[in-house]
């Protein structure tokens, strides 16, 4: 089980990323646009650097929603590999069965 402070930090980062997502995407679009001049790009870069560091989605970490485990997390379910197996074996995830060949 991960420390609650680390899990809460990641949740807080998710909220900040969602809050600034549109603003960040607009600024990045200006930077990638070939038609915008140097002045527009420099102001966009300065505004982008002025955004909070935690507003970047790169700083997020996929974690298991039950245990907070940072590695071995399946995005589709939001669960770590261990909890996914436990829940799937109990038949609580519809459509998931144990492979047999």
Swiss-Prot record:
GO terms for biological process: translation. GO terms for molecular function: rRNA binding; structural constituent of ribosome. GO terms for cellular component: cytoplasm; small ribosomal subunit. Signal peptide: none annotated. Keywords: Ribonucleoprotein, Ribosomal protein, RNA-binding, rRNA-binding. It holds the Pfam family Ribosomal_S14. InterPro entries: Ribosomal_uS14, Ribosomal_uS14_bac/plastid. It comes from the Bacteria. Binds 16S rRNA, required for the assembly of 30S particles and may also be responsible for determining the conformation of the 16S rRNA at the A site. Part of the 30S ribosomal subunit. Contacts proteins S3 and S10. Belongs to the universal ribosomal protein uS14 family. This is Small ribosomal subunit protein uS14.
């Amino acid at each position: 089980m991960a420390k609650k402070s680390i899990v809460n930090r990641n949740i807080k980062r998710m909220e900040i990323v969602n809050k600034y997502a549109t603003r960040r995407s607009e600024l990045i679009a200006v930077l990638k646009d070939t038609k915008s001049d140097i002045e527009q790009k420099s102001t966009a870069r300065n505004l982008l650097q002025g955004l909070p560091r935690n507003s970047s989605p790169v700083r997020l970490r996929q974690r298991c929603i039950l245990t907070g485990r940072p590695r071995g997390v399946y995005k589709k379910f939001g669960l770590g590999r261990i909890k996914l197996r436990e829940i799937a074996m109990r038949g609580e995830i519809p459509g998931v069965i144990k492979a047999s060949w």
